[in-house]
From Swiss-Prot:
The keyword Metal-binding applies. GO terms for cellular component: cytoplasm. Substrate binds at residues 59-61, 91, 276, 286-287. It catalyses: (S)-dihydroorotate + H2O = N-carbamoyl-L-aspartate + H(+). The keyword Ligase does not apply. This is Dihydroorotase.
Amino acid sequence: MEVVLEGKFLLDKRTIEGYIGIEDGKISKISLREIKGDHKIKVDKGKVILPGLIDVHVHLRDFEESYKESIESGTKAAVHGGITVVFDMPNTKPPIMDEKTLKLREHLFKRKSYADYALGFLLAGNKPVEADFYKIFMGASTGGIYSKNFEEDYIRALDIVSIHAEDYEIIQKYPERPPIAEIRAIERVIEAVKTHKKPAHICHISTAKGLKLLLDSRLEMLSFEVTPHHLFLTRSDYDKNPLLKVYPPLRSEEDRIALWKNIDKVPVIASDHAPHTLEDKEAGAAGLPGLETEVPLLLDAVNKGLITLQDIVEKMHINPIKIFGIENKGFEKGKDADFTIVDMKREWTIRADNLYTKAGWTPYEGWRVKGKVIMTIIRGEVVMEEDEIIGKPRGERIVKKGKHRRNLGSSEEH
């Protein structure tokens, strides 16, 4: 046995003390009894070993916008925040809409990524090529490219589609992007999924009505996510700080409360990490950095009794694996030995000065939180410990399952 992790971890929804054996970067054994190994990592009391957390919505910029973020800086931010896999959004500059650009992106990741990664492909009337997932913007957002025929692009996709659901016509007429823009778009997605029965994932749900539509639809092939900024911030925060401009916008306190009230029914939490420089933000750019703050904010919520560690594992590990069909990840024998180790008792203050993102600011500046990521392990190797990035870029592309079916609690489609 090369490496043995010893400490407290979650198994079958229970927290237990045990041992995890790692060989050749894979989980080789999970046991309550001691495992002998060449190298032991002992996790002290008050700290918990979580399976490696996955963020299915990340904008890493690079290409012509490497001054905002690069694959190197963004994946350093990811592992600093306890994220072991990032899903790379394709609305880059230039956008990833052909095979040549996708291959260029993969080449960059192979050389620069500190985290494992999934590669996205943008659909807006173009021909799809094989990718890990596809992205459709129903209305213009950062990058300005949107699908003029959503249903056609959705049908054309070769695998699951992540959808930015804001109706183009409504946001053209009402640039403040009112709730109806999201609601109308969600209605269209639901109808398309009912008709074509192809997997779809709606990004960053922000409204109570949009959430209700999705929960009532009970479609096996349709999943969705919420972001920490829609869970922790509201329109009144934006009124005080225009840097908090984001699409979809921060909503009312009623909407925020509705997301929390239904948090047990939300399949995925994702950051929608969308970094811009302060200069670009002051000029009106939409998007918030979030890779390094999402897990600490959620750990703090665990300490406050709003959610459980099991909820975090389900929404940032178990469900992303099911929904996006990731073959090589999971907390079981034979899967990659990825772990996010957290100190549930550590109190600290979020400061932009201590973050790896190039954004240079955070919406949560000065927030006092209880709970911190202290170590990140990818394929059995420590890549971050106590805020320090360790070693060179060693990220690998995820392995996708073949035609995967998903079951997130409902087998009905109606």
